[in-house]
């Protein structure tokens, strides 16, 4: 029985022998461009189910993977994709760990390839590489959105320029700080923000400020900026922006170059208190503050031969409404109100009788009227004509109906016509218990 060879296996054996005998020393997996296309694998006549046919067809269906040449020859032609650029090992590891972050290797490659004469470009690249290494890169896109739902605290910073160029002679720093820094402390407590004065000219010692500015310390980097007020707020977004607006509105009041406003006047008064200036005396009747107040009265001269000042109270002179010593006091009449500050009258003499206040009518006063005494009939004759004229009227008839004549005769004894013949001063009050001629005689 004649044995037939497979053409595919024959081609594989011939290519293996040619590769092994390649004088260029190329890798066995690298093959040169063939002179004619390789024929397709054919199945054996036995249906491909035999072990011999399957073993011979497997090398053609599954060829070994092609690898990039380590050191290809000059005449070798590689079939496949273009070779990838060579990268440093550290950059390759970073690219494998973070495939999305390709910005840092590119910056480092550009910095290495850049000429050192480009100083500004080298400085900018160094700053950018440092930011990326610290993890501060590409955060600007994330900060464009405010998260109001989570209520996370945020920090706001604003720099308010002080108009020293427009008003170079005005001391804005002293007005904002205040005496011993008390003004800016109260301003921070009122607004709830951190406020500080920074920039060129913010320090009192100019020599020290210049020394710190040239020192290059990042803490004093603000000395290279213009004079400004730095406002810093920390809190939830809504509250932080509200506090910032309030703080900026209050700081704006201190940027007015006016030495006579309320802020400067309060600072002058506070400075006088801190320096130990005594406060104006506070006595009775002496006004301390306020515009338009009357000046204090001059001192009263003392000594013999000097008269009292106008409107002054002299000891021993009667005051309006007061009782003079030795004057007659009428019983039943309340004394006039006394003047505040006037000396009280003394009632130790025998001519003045002390009367209790307010006067109460005593029951013994009715005993002086003498109801048992008889009165003269002179006054009844005067009323007789009036009674006869009004008797016909119903009004007076009803009042007089059923009464006796004796009730009118009892009042007829009173001499009304001769009681007050003229307007004269009433007589002095008689001694208690004496007989009166008339019950109303004292009037």
From Swiss-Prot:
The keyword Calcium does not apply. The modification Omega-N-methylarginine is found at residues 282, 284, 291, 310, 315, 320, 325, 331, 340. The modification Phosphoserine is found at residues 18, 20, 29, 58, 113, 150, 390. It comes from Rattus norvegicus (Rat). The modification Phosphothreonine is found at residues 33, 84, 183. This is KH domain-containing, RNA-binding, signal transduction-associated protein 1. InterPro entries: BBP-like, KH_1_KHDC4/BBP-like, KH_dom, KH_dom_type_1_sf, Qua1_dom, Sam68-YY. Residues 400-420 are annotated as: Interaction with ZBTB7A.
